Amino acid sequence: MNIYAVGGAIRDELLGVPVQDRDYVVVGATPEQMVAQGYRPVGKDFPVFLHPQTHEEYALARTERKTAAGYHGFQFFYAPDVTLEEDLARRDLTINAMAREVRPDGELTGPVIDPFNGQGDVQARVFRHVSDAFLEDPVRILRIARFAARFVDFTVAPETLALMRKMVADGEVDALVAERVWQEVSRGLMEKKPSRMFEVLRECGALARILPEIDALFGVLQRADYHPEVDTGVHVMMVVDHAAQQGYALQVRFAALAHDLGKATTPEDMLPRHIGHEGRSVDLLKPLCERLRVPNDCRDLAVLVAREHGNIHRVMEMGAAALVRLLERSDAIRKPARFAEALQACEADARGRLGFERREYPQAERLRVALVAARGVDAGAVAKRLADAPAGIKDALHQERVRAVELAIS
């Protein structure tokens, strides 16, 4: 029995970036031998075991072949005579198809085992497929795009890009299940430069298949005085990248991505203005979230930002009454943390424009001050005072908040 560390750990070691976790492959063993040594079986489709001390995953070396469409359509074969090279050959990219032997004490030993020149592609900063078996799994398109958002100086090899385009043309991408699309897109949004993910998906044609609402934004004109970058798709990518640079949470980054969807459906005779795009954005966003089964926290924040970002940008012109209406409409008094995230997304929107990257955004502070004042009003006291006339509680509470905000912003 020989144990090897494989894949991302070897790649990251060569790149000089922190190794988050390791994947292990065991060559020359049977499931019974693994159990006899104290490993606990956990794999459903193929034998994966948890180490008795570290609880890290160890998989028996295996091969696979395509049996049906989509990323579920695989049959796996494992046996003690499956070699390390055969196991590495089934992997997606050369940079993920390297290994090093593991000593009994857990330390790596010996040279990098690299049958597909992954080290050369790490040095050249290239994503290159291992073999034409790459064509068999459409998830690999999403993975390459996600890797592009993490390793921003890498490019896709022309021959690999050609295979990705073929997979799109053959309809393989259409077989992807919603949960897997969201899993990869959400992980890509959390990488260093999410725009690279969408750039790669556009290059191979996959973006139009899995996120047509985003793909449709590219080439849509905006007013150059507000948006020197002009192209709506370019603007949205700048917004998402700004949110990533600030380290914002996933729901903020998704809201940044989806805030301007309605600009793609602006009537041509209205361009480059986009009057009413906020409502159209919400109309497109809700079915998108349903289709991809986007988590509720991401969906709810994205809908709020899509609907209100134009109003939030204009709060410097608003008086106390309008500010309170905005806060109440946004449920900010009950959910201040969510509203704080909405302000992050709106600030990213304002700064995600050519030449505006470092521009101040006083709107956020004005709304923070207003929210503190509005939340300071004792709703219970108002309700108690109007116990005999409960129909008037809502309006009275609103007026109290307006007075409190008026004092706070004056």
Swiss-Prot record:
It comes from the Bacteria. Coiled coil: none annotated. Magnesium is required for nucleotidyltransferase activity. CTP binds at G8, R11, R91, R143, R146. InterPro entries: CCA_bact, HD_domain, NT_sf, PolA_pol_head_dom, PolyA_RNA-bd, tRNA_CCA-adding_enzyme. It holds the Pfam family HD. Its cofactor is Mg(2+); Ni(2+). Residues 232-333 form the HD domain. It catalyses: a tRNA precursor + 2 CTP + ATP = a tRNA with a 3' CCA end + 3 diphosphate; a tRNA with a 3' CCA end + 2 CTP + ATP = a tRNA with a 3' CCACCA end + 3 diphosphate. GO terms for biological process: RNA repair; tRNA 3'-terminal CCA addition. Keywords: ATP-binding, Hydrolase, Magnesium, Metal-binding, Multifunctional enzyme, Nickel, Nucleotide-binding, Nucleotidyltransferase, RNA repair, RNA-binding, Transferase, tRNA processing. ATP binds at G8, R11, R91, R143, R146. GO terms for molecular function: ATP binding; CCA tRNA nucleotidyltransferase activity; cyclic-nucleotide phosphodiesterase activity; magnesium ion binding; phosphatase activity; tRNA binding. Its EC number is 2.7.7.72, 3.1.3.-, 3.1.4.-. Gene3D superfamilies: Beta Polymerase, domain 2 (3.30.460.10), cca-adding enzyme, domain 2 (1.10.3090.10). Mg(2+) binds at D21, D23. A single active site specifically recognizes both ATP and CTP and is responsible for their addition. HAMAP family: CCA_bact_type1 (MF_01261), CCA_bact_type2 (MF_01262). Belongs to the tRNA nucleotidyltransferase/poly(A) polymerase family. Bacterial CCA-adding enzyme type 1 subfamily. Monomer. Can also form homodimers and oligomers. Catalyzes the addition and repair of the essential 3'-terminal CCA sequence in tRNAs without using a nucleic acid template. Adds these three nucleotides in the order of C, C, and A to the tRNA nucleotide-73, using CTP and ATP as substrates and producing inorganic pyrophosphate. tRNA 3'-terminal CCA addition is required both for tRNA processing and repair. Also involved in tRNA surveillance by mediating tandem CCA addition to generate a CCACCA at the 3' terminus of unstable tRNAs. While stable tRNAs receive only 3'-terminal CCA, unstable tRNAs are marked with CCACCA and rapidly degraded. Comprises two domains: an N-terminal domain containing the nucleotidyltransferase activity and a C-terminal HD domain associated with both phosphodiesterase and phosphatase activities. This is Multifunctional CCA protein. The lineage of its organism: Bacteria, Pseudomonadati, Pseudomonadota, Betaproteobacteria, Burkholderiales. The gene is cca.
